[in-house]
Swiss-Prot record:
HAMAP family for this protein: Ribosomal_bL35
The entry's keywords: Ribonucleoprotein, Ribosomal protein
Residue segments, region Disordered: 1-29
Name of the protein described by the UniProt record: Large ribosomal subunit protein bL35
GO molecular function, one term: structural constituent of ribosome
Gene Ontology biological-process entries: translation
Cellular component annotations (GO), alphabetically ordered: cytosolic large ribosomal subunit
Family: Belongs to the bacterial ribosomal protein bL35 family.
One Pfam family per UniProt: Ribosomal_L35p
Amino acid sequence: MPKMKTHSGAKKRFKLTGSGKLRRQQANRRHYLEHKSSRLTRRLAGDKIVFKGDAKVIRKMLGI
């Protein structure tokens, strides 16, 4: 059976943490920020951990 190829979109969007969890950025913080409140943009600033169910699929995409 041939090797699985890494999903290009997934490798750009997800990073593996030291403990083995997957990290992702939050949506809605790229552009059109002028009409969004400062409170909202601050809340969207940090990275989040991917949920277990989603992580299983993403791991396959990344070949982990």
